[in-house]
């Protein structure tokens, strides 16, 4: 069984991005800038934002965090976004989820300039991705990171059966669409399973590549996996664990220890897909910068 080490790949990628940032800085006289907006004081969101800022610094990019109180109105937030849309020093805009209930996520997504939508959530970017115009869009960071893992580990995908478990707008839907594309890392026959799927184990056992993104700890069991399958675990679930100082431990959507005995390759949690998401966010930001300077 081969362990797909997202932590190592993300470190390698960030080193490559750092070199590229230095090259582009010499040509443009400035560096890429990412601005993250966080509304409210969700502890998990604050951790994610700190990690993004740290990664920006490591690659030589500028990072700005705008912290807004939970009572910020939707109009105020949209005004902040519009100002960033017009700022030439900002090449990537990210609004950290979740948002307070009185703010409509779709309105926020629509407000971000597609050319700075480095999360890849704007309908213009999603549409270009579905059409296969990948050089004209930003790809959602988690699916993009999974493609990078498949490429760097030279996992054969052409003509393989890929089963995606989950249909979220952030992972499941874009992942399924990407695996259909005619790329070296994709070109699969794709099945999508979700909460209403009947006989799910029968379908997942057909997968040469199984991608779990359902948000339920240890949902994918040994009995649901074909021997020799490649298993990609997107889930990050907190499970109570009194033996840990934090009081919890992280678990994926896959029962790792048992499924690893069946798989030819598998991603761990933590240290698999998670680190890749931030790395691809930085890659998208660098791409936005390069486009804005015609580099």
Curated annotation (Swiss-Prot):
GO annotation, biological process: L-histidine biosynthetic process; methionine biosynthetic process; purine nucleotide biosynthetic process; tetrahydrofolate interconversion
Keywords: Amino-acid biosynthesis, Histidine biosynthesis, Hydrolase, Methionine biosynthesis, Multifunctional enzyme, NADP, One-carbon metabolism, Oxidoreductase, Purine biosynthesis
Catalytic activity: (6R)-5,10-methylene-5,6,7,8-tetrahydrofolate + NADP(+) = (6R)-5,10-methenyltetrahydrofolate + NADPH; (6R)-5,10-methenyltetrahydrofolate + H2O = (6R)-10-formyltetrahydrofolate + H(+)
GO molecular function: methenyltetrahydrofolate cyclohydrolase activity; methylenetetrahydrofolate dehydrogenase (NADP+) activity
InterPro entries: Aminoacid_DH-like_N_sf, NAD(P)-bd_dom_sf, THF_DH/CycHdrlase, THF_DH/CycHdrlase_cat_dom, THF_DH/CycHdrlase_CS, THF_DH/CycHdrlase_NAD-bd_dom
Binding site residues for NADP(+): 166-168, 195, 236
SUPFAM superfamilies hit by this protein: Aminoacid dehydrogenase-like, N-terminal domain, NAD(P)-binding Rossmann-fold domains
Pathway annotation from the record: One-carbon metabolism; tetrahydrofolate interconversion
EC number: 1.5.1.5, 3.5.4.9
Pfam families on file: THF_DHG_CYH (PF00763), THF_DHG_CYH_C (PF02882)
GO cellular component labels: cytosol
Role: Catalyzes the oxidation of 5,10-methylenetetrahydrofolate to 5,10-methenyltetrahydrofolate and then the hydrolysis of 5,10-methenyltetrahydrofolate to 10-formyltetrahydrofolate.
Alphabetical list of PANTHER family matching this protein: C-1-TETRAHYDROFOLATE SYNTHASE, CYTOPLASMIC, C-1-TETRAHYDROFOLATE SYNTHASE, CYTOPLASMIC-RELATED
Description of how the protein assembles with itself and partners: Homodimer.
Family assignment from sequence similarity: Belongs to the tetrahydrofolate dehydrogenase/cyclohydrolase family.
Annotated protein name in UniProt: Bifunctional protein FolD
Organism encoding this protein: Prosthecochloris aestuarii (strain DSM 271 / SK 413)
């Amino acid at each position: 069984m081969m362990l797909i080490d997202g932590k190592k790949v993300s470190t390698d990628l960030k080193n490559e991005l750092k070199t590229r940032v230095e090259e582009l800085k010499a040509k443009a006289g400035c560096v890429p800038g990412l601005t993250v907006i966080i509304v409210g004081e969700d502890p998990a969101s604050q951790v994610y934002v700190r990690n993004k800022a740290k990664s920006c610094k490591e690659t030589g990019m500028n990072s700005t965090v705008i912290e807004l109180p939970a009572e910020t109105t939707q109009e105020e937030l949209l005004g902040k976004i519009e100002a960033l849309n017009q700022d030439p020093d900002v090449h990537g805009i990210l609004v950290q989820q979740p948002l307070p209930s009185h703010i409509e996520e779709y309105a926020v997504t629509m407000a971000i300039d597609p050319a700075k939508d480095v999360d890849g959530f704007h309908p213009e970017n999603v549409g270009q991705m579905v059409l296969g115009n990948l050089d004209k869009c930003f790809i959602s960071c988690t699916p993009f990171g999974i493609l990078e893992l498949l490429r760097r580990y030279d996992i054969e995908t052409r003509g393989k059966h890929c089963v995606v478990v989950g249909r979220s707008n952030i992972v499941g839907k874009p992942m399924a669409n990407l695996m259909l594309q005619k790329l070296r890392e994709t070109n699969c026959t794709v099945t999508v399973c979700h909460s209403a799927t009947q006989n799910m184990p029968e379908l997942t056992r057909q997968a040469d590549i199984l991608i779990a993104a359902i948000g339920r700890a240890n949902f994918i069991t040994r009995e649901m996996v074909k021997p020799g399958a490649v298993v990609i675990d997107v889930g990050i679930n907190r499970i109570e664990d009194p033996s840990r100082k934090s009081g919890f431990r992280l678990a994926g959507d896959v029962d790792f220890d048992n499924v690893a005995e069946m798989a030819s390759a598998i991603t761990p949690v933590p240290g698999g897909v998670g680190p890749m998401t931030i790395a691809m966010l930085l890659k998208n930001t660098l791409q936005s910068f390069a486009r804005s300077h015609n580099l």
